[in-house]
Amino acid sequence: MKIKKYFPLIFGFSIVIIIFVILAMNKGPKAILFYGDTCPHCKNVDEFMNANKTREKIAFKKLEVYNNQSNAQLLTQTAKNCGLDTSAGVGVPLFYNGDTCLMGDQDIINYFKQQ
């Protein structure tokens, strides 16, 4: 009997908890900069970001792909989602801003300049 009495309260509380968890999971930056640790074009982007304090202006994750297989797989999936041809692999740097993919140091630097 007590279970029936408290069920709506427990159910409602559970729904609120689930909503908070979902919102917390979606709070992080959606933008991602994929790079390789020995990539010279990636170094150009990194130098620009450091000189212009880009990380203070734009929230994004940096994911290294040469030494991290799961990051490399995410890079490939992201490129596919952007409609890029991945049959010959995907080059870095690649910046995904949540909507589109920008590939190559100059396109990424130009995007950062506009922000």
State what each model feature region is:
Residues Y35-T38:
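Short pre-active-site segment immediately N-terminal to redox-active cysteine/selenocysteine motifs
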